[in-house]
């Protein structure tokens, strides 16, 4: 069976980047519209520019996917409808979507748009993929934390799968980041991430960008990915330059073509091209191919590393003699690096071959010394070549017939689409008759068009003797054929990719709405120690929700019987397919003791469990259509999204589904799949069997460690143990406390949710009693410790 080569999907932050991607060999591009895209700082496209982009891409048989992948506020649904209508009118092929409400609107109102589930939906297993299909999605962009095994399991469900192969990686588990939002009001879920994960932190003697990941590069692993059933290979970079897009696209195009031909070999020259155009401390193979800890994180640099160029040999005044290990070109951007200092420079002078010595003029403030390293940040020759990309000529064939007394006819075909045009009636020559050579000379003039006659045999001309063919008529005939083929080729390609339409929510996942245990008088408490359950119930909790710190079959078999009958279980936001299957078997075995489960990812709404399901914060029901989708999937309630203000939340009322408002608790700002302590120790293997946290000599074994930012805010880290290793939660520096806004909660008609993480047993019971009293109408004193209102009053961009 021949190998089905995956699609190469490349970024287009603006028109120049789009043309670079198309011209360099992309099979598809993804880009942002003027609103509701997750890269608000990119140039993006308005309706007119998007329509032109779609025409250009479709002419070259390149698909266009538009990101509509932010979370949408209740008051923005009318603007969303208008934007989706404009996008659909351009003929774009698909919308990449995170928000369940956006998906519902596309499904109902704009069925010509295919739906792709954004990586922010955190689909990472087969159950999530099946749920996505039931919601009308034809493709899922897998969570970046997926293993190759998980990717294969998802592909086996029949849905198209897309994985990232190159570019920047988010530190946080997909769809689970509030760090930028809570730190400065710029929400990554709204396309305005300020990248606080690239900033410096301190932890237990370590200092630096402890959360900053290397860039992903799976160039050498393309054969494995192609054999896995993955349908699309995605390059990150809508904020990158057109030159970056051209270089990365062309490298991956050549490599994929080699895979298709069966002669792929890892090419160090191509890899060096990728390193030169951009890298952060080298590359990582990412979670999908098993990279761990120090192979993921680059704790030294967050900006472009460049490539080593050479060392300073001698310094005289403002001139440095530089021995170069690579060829140096006029206009190269360089960086002189010493201990704790660096200076950006630009080389101006003759090209120097590898092994030669260059004279480098220094900036007045540059303190150069012999032995200092010099890196090249930008290769002027590479950039010049990248800018020289041109559209790929589309091979065509022509057949012309010029018969006396008959209209001129010309057929132009690209092998799939053919057009035939006619011209004026052919007259008898009054002087010199026209020849086949004359006709060929005019018809062959395809310069300035997308088409090319690659061989002379592709132009067949039949000319009667004694006729006259005006040059103007031949040119007009050719132009007419070209214009019609452009139009027909574009329309045929666009229609070939359109979905047949979206069905209503699949009956396999549409469930009857159960009687809900959630109401305005509910006091729900999330806790992690089974021994505290009875005390929390006595303190006034009406719904107990256990969030295990160890989520393994063995631990669940031990802990679930210790819970009071009717307690709920909070599922972790992320589980591998193998862990989920094993743990669900234990949950089903104890289902008679449990009151229900709290789902913390969209995919978990599709799990087959004989229990009520409550949609937690990990299932962002952020607008009325999103809440309605959650309701249709059988959830008995949901937790209000923490980024909306009270006035924005009022757009959900009257609530179509019972809701809880988190009135106390530290927000989970990030979920990490790497461990800073293991990074500090230089560990790259053994995450599954790691025992550092059980070593009494370890600081993190005695108490939850903390990350401290440059402003002195301390962010606690908590661990959840899985068979494959730990997942760390980065918690807010301050707990959210909405006791002073209880009138708002009552106006919404929502119950209370307390989420305990680092609080002591005594603090948990005390806080539960406080909120139970508040729920009964008793006055409540302010907290005796520092808290925050979160986004309840200030909102997010």
Which residues are covered by each model-predicted region?
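Surface-exposed amphipathic alpha-helical tracts and adjacent flexible/coil segments at the periphery
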Residues: 1-23, 28-39, 54, 60-88, ...
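Glycine-rich, highly charged phosphate/nucleotide-binding loops
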Residues: 45-50
């Amino acid at each position: 069976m021949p190998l089905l080569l995956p699609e190469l999907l490349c970024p287009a932050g603006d028109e120049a980047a789009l043309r670079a991607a198309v011209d360099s060999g992309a099979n598809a591009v993804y880009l942002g519209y003027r609103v509701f895209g997750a890269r608000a700082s990119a140039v993006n496209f308005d309706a007119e520019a998007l329509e032109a982009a779609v025409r250009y891409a479709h002419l070259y048989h390149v698909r266009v996917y538009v990101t509509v992948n932010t979370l949408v506020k209740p008051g923005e649904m009318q603007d969303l409808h208008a934007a989706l209508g404009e996008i659909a009118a351009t003929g774009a092929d698909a919308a990449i979507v995170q928000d369940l409400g956006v998906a519902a609107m596309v499904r109902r109102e704009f069925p010509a748009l295919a739906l792709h589930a954004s990586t922010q939906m955190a689909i990472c297993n087969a159950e999530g993929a099946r749920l996505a299909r039931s919601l009308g999605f034809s493709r899922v962009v897998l969570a970046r934390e997926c293993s190759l095994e998980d990717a294969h399991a998802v592909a086996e469900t029949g849905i198209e799968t897309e994985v990232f192969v190159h570019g920047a990686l988010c530190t946080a588990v997909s769809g689970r980041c509030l760090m930028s939002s809570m730190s400065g009001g710029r929400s990554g879920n709204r396309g305005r991430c300020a990248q606080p994960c690239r900033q410096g932190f301190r932890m237990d003697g370590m200092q630096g960008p402890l959360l900053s990941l290397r860039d992903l590069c799976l160039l050498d692993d393309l054969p494995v990915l192609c054999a896995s059933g993955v349908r699309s290979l995605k390059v990150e970079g809508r904020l990158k330059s057109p030159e970056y897009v051209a270089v990365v696209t062309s490298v991956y195009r050549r490599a994929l073509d080699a895979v298709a031909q069966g002669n792929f070999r890892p090419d160090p020259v191509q890899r060096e091209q990728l390193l030169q155009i951009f890298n952060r401390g080298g590359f990582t193979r990412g979670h999908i191919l098993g990279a761990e800890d120090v192979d993921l994180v680059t704790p030294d640099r967050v900006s472009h590393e460049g490539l080593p160029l050479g060392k300073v040999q001698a310094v005289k005044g403002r001139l440095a003699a530089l021995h170069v290990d690579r060829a140096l070109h006029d206009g190269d951007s360089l960086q002189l690096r010493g201990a704790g200092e660096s200076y950006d420079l630009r080389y101006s002078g003759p090209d120097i071959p590898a092994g030669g010595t260059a004279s480098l003029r220094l900036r007045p403030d540059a303190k150069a010394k012999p032995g200092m390293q010099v890196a090249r940040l930008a290769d002027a020759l590479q950039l010049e070549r990248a800018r020289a990309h041109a559209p790929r000529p589309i091979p065509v064939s022509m057949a012309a017939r010029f018969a006396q007394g008959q209209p001129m006819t010309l057929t132009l075909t690209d092998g799939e689409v053919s057009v035939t045009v006619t011209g004026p009636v052919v007259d008898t020559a009054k002087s010199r008759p026209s020849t086949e050579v004359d006709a060929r000379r005019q018809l062959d003039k395809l310069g300035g068009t997308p088409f090319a006659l690659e061989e002379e045999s592709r132009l067949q001309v039949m000319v009667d003797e004694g006729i006259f063919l005006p040059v103007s008529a031949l040119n007009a005939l050719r132009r007419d054929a070209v214009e019609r083929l452009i139009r027909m080729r574009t329309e045929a390609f666009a229609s070939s990719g359109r979905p047949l339409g979206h069905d209503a929510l699949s009956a396999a996942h549409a469930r009857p709405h159960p009687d809900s245990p959630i109401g305005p008088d509910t006091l729900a408490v999330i806790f992690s120690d089974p021994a505290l359950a009875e005390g929390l119930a006595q303190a006034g909790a009406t719904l107990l929700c256990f969030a295990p710190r160890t989520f393994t079959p063995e631990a669940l078999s031990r802990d679930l019987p210790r819970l009071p009958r009717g307690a709920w279980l909070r599922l972790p936001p992320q589980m591998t397919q193998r862990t989920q299957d094993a743990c669900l078997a234990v949950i089903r075995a104890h289902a008679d003791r449990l009151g229900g489960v709290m789902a913390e990812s969209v995919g978990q709404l599709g799990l087959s469990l004989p229990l009520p399901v409550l949609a937690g914060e990990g299932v962002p029901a952020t607008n009325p259509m999103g809440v309605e989708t959650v309701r249709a999937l059988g959830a008995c309630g949901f937790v209000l999204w923490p980024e909306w203000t009270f006035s924005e939340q009022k757009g959900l009322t009257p609530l179509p589904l019972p809701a809880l408002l988190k009135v106390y608790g530290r927000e989970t700002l990030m979920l990490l799949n790497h461990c800073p302590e293991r990074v500090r120790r230089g560990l790259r293997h053994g995450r599954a069997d790691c025992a550092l946290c059980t070593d009494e000599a370890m600081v993190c074994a005695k108490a939850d460690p903390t990350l401290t930012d440059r402003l002195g805010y301390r962010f606690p880290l908590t661990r959840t143990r899985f068979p494959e290793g730990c997942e760390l939660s980065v918690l807010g520096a301050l707990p959210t406390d909405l006791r002073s806004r209880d009138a708002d909660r009552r106006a919404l008609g929502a119950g209370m949710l307390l989420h305990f993480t680092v609080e002591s047993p005594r603090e948990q019971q005390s806080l539960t009693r406080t909120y139970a009293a508040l729920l009964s109408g008793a006055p409540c004193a302010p907290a005796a410790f520092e808290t925050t209102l979160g986004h309840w009053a200030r909102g997010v961009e």
